[in-house]
Amino acid sequence: VNHPAPPALARRPFPTELLDQLRSTFGERVSTSEAVRAHHGRDESPFDPQLPDAVVFAQSTGDIQTIVKLCARHGVPIIPYGNGSSLEGHLLAVQGGVSIDLSQMNRVLSINAEDLTVTVEPGISRKQLNEALRDTGLFFPIDPGADASIGGMTATRASGTNAVRYGTMRENVLGLSAVLADGRVVKTGTRARKSSAGYDLTRLFVGSEGTLGVITEITVRLYPQPEAVSAAVCAFPSMAEAVRTVIETIQIGVPIARVEFIDSLAVRAINKHSNLTLREKHTLFFEFHGTEAGVAEQAQLVQELAAQHGGEGFEWATRPEDRSRLWNARHNAYFAMLQLKPGCRAVTTDVCVPISRLAECVIETETDLKASPLPCPIVGHVGDGNFHVAILIDPDKPEEIDEAERLNRRIVQRAIAMDGTCTGEHGIGLHKMDFLVEEHGADTIDTMRAIKHALDPHNLMNPGKIFSWAA
């Protein structure tokens, strides 16, 4: 987990001539300072930093084309950088190269309220986008825990707490533009709600983790802001009863907007970090969207289901400030959990299974975690079968690294055996390449590799991620 890049990923040469060309073109928007490179060579993954040779702050698609063409001429890797919130090492420059910082490409290019779409640059964050939409009566619902960039969310096929109602980035990106490894720009998709025109290149780039090109524009779906919103918290006597409540809620068709599971250890961490007073038991957070009558009906149904499974009295959060406090605490759960073991790093699992197998998967995982000496809180978007274990390790203790790898492998292999996936929303990055092969098989990975070779024949686009260059 905490090992440097393997020898097969040796750094490539970074010619002085390339640096001179970048500086003559972009001036002060090029940095080789240790601090800037260090900031762009780490993320929220457990891996040691891997610094790029230089960072360039792009301001337009034309800038990115120029950077890519110069790097291609010299055979230097390119790593796109959004907000730095990856949990899988996507941003690490394992072969050196140029980090393209997209944070200054943060404009809303067009809002099409009648069509419920918006086109944005990749550096805008989800919070910035929703702030820009505030007066339109519309919102963009996908909300991973971090305030991630829309470009990064697209590149990792991200989702979040309300995917159970609104889907993931896969369902919500209608089209995009990307700069390929040779500097050409491709535009995929349209603003039409559907299309049967050719290969679905939009879906190819959504989840490509920067390995096929640099995404420069994204068109996403918007949704009307609901008339009524209500949130609630409910504690349960066991993990199994909490999860079964969720499964029954989904199976009877309640259109719940969010349902999050937080185990008792994670609740303790959240209480301390966010100054809450939740019962330190296995807990579900709910949110309901709709009309006043619809929300009341949904809440009543779910409350009855929870009571059948030992749920202890709903605590309601109907005021916007109370809901914000609750969901901010959930979104900060990762950092809260790190405080359970000061100085630790977290190896974070991301399995997702069919909802029919969720209870079995979570219960068997809980048994594994109870037998481990490591603290391992669990949180999850259980409404769509996705949950995360944060395995907290001391990176200086090899035995803890080994134990984390053992637990991680058991959790992933269990999910795959249940027709699930090794990653529901974080992506493959550096950490899950072996699991990708287990999940899909060698022939499927060879097909992915053939696409990569066709679009990026010199392996310049974020090399070392998703799968190895050679079979």
Q: Model-predicted segments: where are they?
A:
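FAD-binding subdomain of flavoenzyme oxidoreductases
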Residues: 107-260
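N-terminal flexible segment immediately upstream of the FAD-binding catalytic core
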Residues: 1-69, 73, 85-116, 264-274, ...
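Alpha-helix capping/hinge segments and adjacent helical runs
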Residues: 28, 416-428, 453, 457-461
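C-terminal substrate-recognition/cap domain of FAD-linked oxidoreductases
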Residues: 32-41, 223-224, 230, 235, ...
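Activity-critical C-terminal alpha-helical subdomain
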Residues: 184, 433-471
